[in-house]
Amino acid sequence: MEEERNSDEKENALCGRSLTAASRDGGGRMPAAPLAQGKVERGKVYSGDGVLGYLEMLEAQAHELGLKQEEKEQQEKKLDRLKARVQELRARRDELRAKVELQEKRLLDKEGVMTDPAQPSAQTVLEWKVKSLKAMLQVFYLTGISGKLTKQGVCFCISTAYEGTYLDSYYVDLLIKPLVKIQRHSVPVFIPLEQIAKKYLQTDIRRFLSVLSDHLNAYVGRRRQADQLEEHFSDHIDGTLQRNSLCNLLVFNYTVSSNSKTFPFNVRLLYGDLCCSLPTEAIISCTPGTLPLLAEMAAAHSNAFRHMALHKAFDSLINAKESQN
């Protein structure tokens, strides 16, 4: 019994040494699987501060950048769609203008060959005028001119503005049968409406409205500038600003200080172009016999008044004067 037990112990010892040897590689090293498993386990324990945490941060940043890139691409696509829509509207506008011009030409040609009084030429002309006016209303919608058809013609509304500020609206009620003529209007008497109508109303209504709109917008622009000057710079002006109804002639006085002396200047602004809100001539005079520097200053002021809005030009002159003082 004792011999059998000793034999079993020797056999088990030999098996243990064989397993130990088999578990080692050729250099006597233990396999890497348990060590690798230990690293993974340690990585799981310290993932918040280790490599996995860094990878999670990179993944979050990549996701955020992806969202921003997607948003940018969507904005670019939206901008491209808006640009395409603008081009489409412009093309539609040009198409309507071309149709109106073609209809006008056809009507003139048709009236030239009509000799039979039995033909319903008056009705044909009236129908054409109504169609032309409808197309014209669509063309003018984005230019500050709107209108609506009436039983006898069309009533136009011309809206005016200056520097993005809406000011006044004026109305022109036109009759289109048998000839185009003005029935009623709210245009100021000093606007040359009769001359404009005589020149364009019978041959080109679109041109008539465009020129009239230019006159009205230029007038309210000049008036707005004069109002701004009186409102914001009254303490720099001597006396009152003088102007006529059309505001195409403005006269006022202001003073300039130099070397403890005060020199008065007189300004006379003439607006030769009634379709423009800037003067064509700016005459500035100062006391005779004053310093040559004042003459140079007057020339600089004249140039500013001719190239800038009145209140903006005066503001720049006042600021320049205060800087010099």
From Swiss-Prot:
For whether the record's keyword set contains Magnesium, the answer is: no
Q: What is its main location?
A: nucleus
Q: What happens when the gene is disrupted?
A: Increases time to progress through G2/M phase.
Q: Which InterPro entries match?
A: CENP-O (IPR018464)
Q: Which CDD domains match?
A: DRWD-C_CENP-O, DRWD-N_CENP-O
Q: Which UniProt keywords apply?
A: Centromere, Chromosome, Coiled coil, Nucleus
Q: Name one Pfam family in it.
A: CENP-O
Query: Annotated region Disordered: where?
Result: 1-35
The question of whether Nucleus is a record keyword is answered with yes
| Coiled coil stretches, renumbered | 55-112
The entry's family comment says:
Belongs to the CENP-O/MCM21 family.
PANTHER family membership: CENTROMERE PROTEIN O, INNER KINETOCHORE SUBUNIT MAL2
Q: What job does this protein perform?
A: Component of the CENPA-HI complex, a centromeric complex involved in assembly of kinetochore proteins, mitotic progression and chromosome segregation. Involved in kinetochore assembly and required for recovery from spindle damage.
The record's note on quaternary structure and interaction partners says: Component of the CENPA-HI complex, at least composed of CENPH, CENPI, CENPK, CENPL, CENPM, CENPO and CENPP. Component of a discrete complex composed of at least CENPO, CENPP, CENPQ, CENPR and CENPU.
Protein's recorded name: Centromere protein O
- The scientific name of the source species is Gallus gallus (Chicken)
